[in-house]
Amino acid sequence: MAKLHDFYKDNVVSDLQTQFGYTSVMQVPRIEKITLNMGVGEALADKKVLENAASDMAAISGQKPLITKARRSVAGFKIREGYPIGCKVTLRGSRMWEFFERLVTIAIPRVRDFRGLNAKSFDGRGNYSMGVREQIIFPEIDYDKVDKVRGLDITITTSAKTDEEGRALLSAFNFPFRK
C-alpha cells in the first residue's frame, strides 16, 4: 500500500475521530475513489488526438481509460450521439492511493504560478473537484512526446457527509488549499 494510506490509518483516522467526535472508526470519512476526466473536443476532426489523450491518461493513472461518448447530438458543437469525445479513469484501492500521493507531493507543486487550491470547490457532500490546465505537471508525461498540452478534471470522492468533514480529511493529507 501507499505511504499515504498507512498515514491515513495510523494518524488521520484518530485525529478526525477526536475532531468531530465520532464514536466509531467507520464513521470517519475516507477517500473512496478518484476520477480523472479529459474532454477532447478536437477528437471529432482527428481520431489520433483521442488516442494521444488516452495514452497520456493511461500513463498518468496506470490503467486503461474508458472512451466517453456523446450522450446526445448538439448541432452547435457539430457532434452526434455516440461520437467519442473524451476519456475517463476511475481509480480505487491501491492505485488510487498511489495517484493521490503523486498528486499531492509531485504534481501540484509543479503547477506554474501556484497559489493554492480553491477551498470552495466542494460539492456540498464532501467531494472535491479540481481542474488541471496542463497534463505535463505529472512526471509520467514526457514533455517532448506530447502532441498538445491539454487539461483534465480530477474529482476526489469521499465518504464525508459535509464539506467541512471533506476539507478536514484532505487538509490532514497536507492538501494545499488557498488560505
From Swiss-Prot:
InterPro entries cross-referenced by the UniProt entry: Ribosomal_uL5, Ribosomal_uL5_bac-type, Ribosomal_uL5_C, Ribosomal_uL5_CS, Ribosomal_uL5_dom_sf, Ribosomal_uL5_N
Pfam families assigned to the protein according to its UniProt record, in alphabetical order: Ribosomal_L5, Ribosomal_L5_C
Keyword annotations: Ribonucleoprotein, Ribosomal protein, RNA-binding, rRNA-binding, tRNA-binding
Q: Which SUPFAM superfamilies match?
A: RL5-like (SSF55282)
Protein's GO biological process: translation
Keyword Transcription regulation carried by entry: no
Question: What Gene Ontology cellular component terms go with this record?
Answer: ribonucleoprotein complex; ribosome
Report the GO molecular function annotations: rRNA binding; structural constituent of ribosome; tRNA binding
Protein family (similarity comment): Belongs to the universal ribosomal protein uL5 family.
Q: Which HAMAP family match?
A: Ribosomal_uL5_B
Q: How does it assemble?
A: Part of the 50S ribosomal subunit; part of the 5S rRNA/L5/L18/L25 subcomplex. Contacts the 5S rRNA and the P site tRNA. Forms a bridge to the 30S subunit in the 70S ribosome.
Record's function text: This is one of the proteins that bind and probably mediate the attachment of the 5S RNA into the large ribosomal subunit, where it forms part of the central protuberance. In the 70S ribosome it contacts protein S13 of the 30S subunit (bridge B1b), connecting the 2 subunits; this bridge is implicated in subunit movement. Contacts the P site tRNA; the 5S rRNA and some of its associated proteins might help stabilize positioning of ribosome-bound tRNAs.
The protein's name in its UniProt record: Large ribosomal subunit protein uL5
What is the scientific name of the source organism? Psychromonas ingrahamii (strain DSM 17664 / CCUG 51855 / 37)
Gene label: rplE
